[in-house]
Amino acid sequence: MHRVTVTLDDDLMKKLDAIIEARGYQNRSEAIRDLARIGIQQTSAHASAEHCVGAMVYTYDHSKRDLPRKLTQSFHNHHELSRATMHVHLDHDQCLEVTILDGKANEIQHFADHIFSERGVRYGRLVTIPTSGDGHAHD
C-alpha cells in the first residue's frame, strides 16, 4: 500500500467528513479508497464499448442564442442512442431534460459530454447501467 498526501479545501473536507460519518467509515483513508474505486469504475464503464442503458439529465437556458437548435441537432446526429426524452419548463428561461439512452457506453458518454459542454447547459449528469446485450424483442 502507498501513502499519499492530499490537500483539500475546508468545504470539501467538511463534505468528506459528512460522508465518512453517514456511511460509518472507520477513517478517512478507507473513505477515500472507496470513493477512488467508484470513480475508477465509472470512468472504466464509460470508456468501454459494452452495451448499456443510461439516463442523461441536464438543465439549460433555452434563451441562449441557438442552444435549442444545437441540442436538437445533436439529438438528430445521435438518434440511434436516444429512446425517450422528457422536457420540463422550470421557469421562464430554464428547462430540464431527462433522456433515456441505449447503446455502447463509450458512445453514450461521448454524446452526453457533447451535450453538457454546450454553452448554456448549466448542469449535466449521466448514469449508465451495463446490460447483457444489444437489446431484445419481447416474444
From Swiss-Prot:
InterPro entries recorded: Acetolactate_synth/TF_NikR_C, ACT-like_dom_sf, Arc_rbn_hlx_hlx, CopG, CopG/NikR_regulator, Ni_resp_reg_NikR, Nickel_NikR_proteobac, Ribbon_hlx_hlx
Cell membrane is among the record's keywords: no
GO biological process assignments: response to nickel cation
A GO MF term: DNA binding
Organism domain of life: Bacteria
Annotated binding of Ni(2+), by residue: 76, 87, 89, 95
Cofactor: Ni(2+)
A Pfam family reported for this protein in Swiss-Prot or TrEMBL: RHH_1
Described function: Transcriptional regulator.
Family, per entry: Belongs to the transcriptional regulatory CopG/NikR family.
Name this polypeptide is given: Putative nickel-responsive regulator
Organism for this UniProt entry: Rhodopseudomonas palustris (strain HaA2)
Organismal lineage: Bacteria, Pseudomonadati, Pseudomonadota, Alphaproteobacteria, Hyphomicrobiales
